[in-house]
């Protein structure tokens, strides 16, 4: 009867553990390896907890004790210290999560655990599992890190182009307007050149008809007036060539 009543008095674990049974540590184990244990309190009462291990020198647990409010979750970080991994050696390390409902006005946690009765305690046990990554896992871990900069470079490469295109369009419009203006000036200069040439011919005819002996003077006059429009045409051509060259570049 006593054993039956003792068994009935044993409380089931009130917290929900994630993971529920195994704490998995993934190698290589040349550095500290951390795994997380989540403790969720689904009840409407505060719950005190503490985490124990069979190998306290091999692990660092933060936090290793505390109080969980109703409906809250606490994440416990379990840190495995570096060691020489032997695949033929099976891990015998275990953890235990021990809990008790927090009494009213809890202030001294040590006193709570010391004064706790065995039938008030709830516990869950977890075993430690060591996993060594294979070559495929290593390649899979490396591929995403390589893919990120490649995708980023493809996306980032063409980004400046729209800005440069808009600048070229604006510059093109300005150059086209300038070319049209210079073409108009060139047409005016050609018209003036034609007019001056006709005027020169008329003057030569008048000079020949009035004074036959003054051929040298008329020739001199023609040589002075003719280069002027030609020079203007050359200057206009230089300006047009300059702006067209800028447009092409």
Swiss-Prot record:
Reported impact of residue 50 to L: Impairs the interaction of the MSP domain with the phosphorylated FFAT motif of STARD3. Does not affect its ability to interact with the conventional FFAT motif of OSBPL1A
Sites bearing N6-acetyllysine, chain numbering: 125
Keywords, sorted A to Z: Acetylation, Cell junction, Cell membrane, Coiled coil, Disulfide bond, Endoplasmic reticulum, Host-virus interaction, Membrane, Nucleus, Phosphoprotein, Tight junction, Transmembrane, Transmembrane helix
Tissue: Ubiquitous.
phosphorylated FFAT motif binding: region residues: 50-53
Comment, domains: The MSP domain binds the FFAT motif of many proteins.
Designated name of the protein: Vesicle-associated membrane protein-associated protein A
Phylogenetic classification of the source organism: Eukaryota, Metazoa, Chordata, Craniata, Vertebrata
């Amino acid at each position: 009867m006593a054993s039956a009543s003792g068994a009935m008095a044993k409380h089931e674990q009130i917290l929900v553990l994630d993971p529920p049974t195994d704490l998995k540590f993934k190698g290589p184990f040349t550095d500290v390896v951390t795994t997380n244990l989540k403790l969720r309190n689904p009840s409407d009462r505060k719950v005190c907890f503490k985490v124990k291990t069979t190998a306290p020198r091999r692990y660092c647990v933060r936090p290793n004790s505390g109080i969980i409010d109703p409906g809250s979750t606490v994440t416990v970080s379990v840190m495995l210290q570096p060691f020489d991994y032997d695949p033929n050696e099976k891990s015998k390390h275990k953890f235990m999560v021990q809990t008790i409902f927090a009494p009213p006005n809890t202030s001294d946690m040590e006193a709570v655990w010391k004064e706790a009765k065995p039938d008030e305690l709830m516990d869950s046990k977890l075993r430690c599992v060591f996993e060594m990554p294979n070559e495929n896992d290593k390649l899979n871990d490396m591929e995403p890190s390589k893919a990120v900069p490649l995708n980023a470079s493809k996306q980032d490469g063409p980004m400046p182009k729209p800005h440069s295109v808009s600048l070229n369009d604006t510059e093109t419009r300005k150059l086209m307007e300038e070319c049209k203006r210079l073409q108009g000036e060139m047409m005016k200069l050609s018209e003036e050149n034609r007019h001056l040439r006709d005027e020169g011919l008329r003057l030569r005819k008048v000079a020949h008809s009035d004074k036959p002996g003054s051929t040298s003077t008329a020739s001199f006059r023609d040589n002075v007036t003719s280069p002027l429009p030609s020079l203007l045409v050359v200057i206009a051509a230089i300006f047009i060539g300059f702006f067209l060259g800028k447009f092409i570049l």
